[in-house]
Amino acid sequence: GEVIQRPASAVKELMENSIDSGAEKIQLIIKDAGKTLIQVIDDGCGMTEQDARMSFERHATSKINTAVDLFAIKSMGFRGEAMESMAAIAHIELKSKQTKKELGTHIIIQGGKVEKQEDCACANGTSISIKNLFYNVPARRNFLKSDKVETRHIIEQFSRIALANPDISISMFLDDVEHFHLGKSNTRQRIVNITGAKSNQKLVPIKEETTLVNLAGFIGKPEFCKRTRGEQYFFVNNRFIKSTYLHHAVKKAYSGLIPDNYFPSY
């Protein structure tokens, strides 16, 4: 379970798997800040019976076949560690079906062991439920913060993925209440849908293309800067990154426009 530090880590891994599957619609369901249930449902390509079972084996991945593939990775994940890590520390139920198949496969795993696998009737795509996270690692479970803090981490992780993929319809339920319902849109509309309608007037589009890199996105107008960090997102090839170097570069561009102890949004 070393890859999974908290419920938000599992949310990231599962949602990225859905993106890699070519999903156009992803649903995230959370109960008790992810301690009781983390469920992700997508309409992606689904898995074969064998791939579904293999996905829980360590370093088993369908995303690379040869060493050369390592230098041309376009998928979010490729090491094959996360699913195996989750299987070791939670109760897992997976249903997956490929479009051309009449039946899908249904797997139940407990403590890293496959308890059951059978054919099932289910929708195209994949539904995976992570239940009772860290049930067999009490020290790790006790290390988790309050439900409020863990939920905040989950929402932040969800927001990063949603911002990077405006072309995918994504929704999120917290304890049976719909918290986000984001239809397919462009980047600007996705930002507004996540951060609130008032943010639309704050946004300034930027675009730069060079032989080395293409840069596009939005920055916030100086008058809307804040005393606190947050609302700062860098994505490289649709992956969220944290970079002190890049953050300082942006902050330097704002010098003279905002007070030293304030932070711009981007």
For the regions a language model picked out, list residue spans one by one.
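N-terminal phosphate-binding caps/lids of nucleotide- and nucleic-acid-binding domains
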Residues: 2-266
